[in-house]
Curated annotation (Swiss-Prot):
Coiled coil: none annotated. SMART domains: Ribosomal_L14 (SM01374). It comes from Pleurastrum terricola. Keywords: Chloroplast, Plastid, Ribonucleoprotein, Ribosomal protein, RNA-binding, rRNA-binding. This is Large ribosomal subunit protein uL14c.
């Protein structure tokens, strides 16, 4: 469960390291974001000499959360960290690589480009 003011790690090579969520998109006053939700975030930590700079406003999709996700088959999955991948307006990733596993729920939310770049889908 991601809410405004939550810090997330960046799971791609776009140049940002840490994001802070400032808004969850979808719905009038959506309070919490889960895996597959698009958020508006601000870059809090970035690598030098990269296109993304600190204090830049970006869109990102949540790929891992510490809060468990219950699936229809009775299983649940939980990750060690909150992580997101920075995307553009069309929903394509800004980076060229994704680090770490991503959840299968991204494929159901039509983020197939993110799923194809990920090294592991759980």
């Amino acid at each position: 469960m991601i809410q405004p003011q939550t810090y997330l790690n960046v799971a791609d090579n776009s140049g940002a390291r840490k994001l802070m969520c400032i808004r969850i998109l979808g719905g009038r006053q959506k309070q919490y974001g889960k895996i597959g939700d698009v958020i508006i975030a601000v870059v809090k930590d970035a690598l030098p000499n990269m296109p993304l700079k600190k204090s830049e406003i970006v869109r990102a999709v949540i790929v891992r959360t510490r809060k468990g996700v219950n699936r229809n088959n009775g299983t649940s999955i939980r990750f060690d960290e909150n992580a997101a991948v920075i995307i553009n307006k069309e929903g394509n990733p800004r980076g060229t690589r994704i680090f770490g596993p991503v959840a299968r729920e991204l494929r159901e939310r039509n983020f197939t480009k993110l799923v194809s770049l990920a090294p592991e889908v759980l």
